[in-house]
Amino acid sequence: MKKLALFALLMVPAILLASGHDSGEASRYLTQTGRESDFWPRVINFTIFAAILYYLIANPIKNFFKGRREGIAGQLKEIESKLQAAKDEKKEAQSHLNESVNKAAEIIEDAKKEAEILAAKIAEASENELVVLEKQFEEKITLEERKAARDVIDEVLSENITTDDIALDETKVVDIISRKAEHGKVA
């Protein structure tokens, strides 16, 4: 591209100078310089101008584009580092999410086990309480049976024993109790 631009800069003035002029102007130049055309001096002047222009502008233009390239490279690196940081954060968040899901599953499983243990303890306590209540009920029944038997014995003894019967022997007491039992008063 550079070579094409330099070639165009050299050829355009040559083409312009090659166009025809009035003969009066050409003769005047010939008398002043001793040459028929000023093509070569103009080429030399243009070359000097282009060289000076290149000398003055080339480094600032190179520096500008170099700075621009470095700026773009820096921005690209910054964007890549941000992208990598975002990917790392995403991975970390994903690992935290997986860890939380695992922990939640573990908590749920522990809660189920704890519920089973509590249910078993409650069932066991209920069974123990039922056993105790049944035992108390049986003891109360036994106590009531004894109490009823005592009441019946007291009643039988108080009704059937008179002052004449104070001298009772064992056979007589058994006979009285068996009579009462036959009538259905002893449970």
Curated annotation (Swiss-Prot):
InterPro entries: ATP_synth_b/b'su_bac/chlpt, ATP_synthase_B_chain. One of its GO terms (molecular function) is proton-transporting ATPase activity, rotational mechanism. Keywords: ATP synthesis, Cell inner membrane, Cell membrane, CF(0), Hydrogen ion transport, Ion transport, Membrane, Transmembrane, Transmembrane helix, Transport. The keyword Acyltransferase does not apply. The chain crosses the membrane at residues 4-24. F(1)F(0) ATP synthase produces ATP from ADP in the presence of a proton or sodium gradient. F-type ATPases consist of two structural domains, F(1) containing the extramembraneous catalytic core and F(0) containing the membrane proton channel, linked together by a central stalk and a peripheral stalk. During catalysis, ATP synthesis in the catalytic domain of F(1) is coupled via a rotary mechanism of the central stalk subunits to proton translocation. Component of the F(0) channel, it forms part of the peripheral stalk, linking F(1) to F(0). Belongs to the ATPase B chain family. This is ATP synthase subunit b. It comes from Sulfurovum sp. (strain NBC37-1). The gene is atpF.
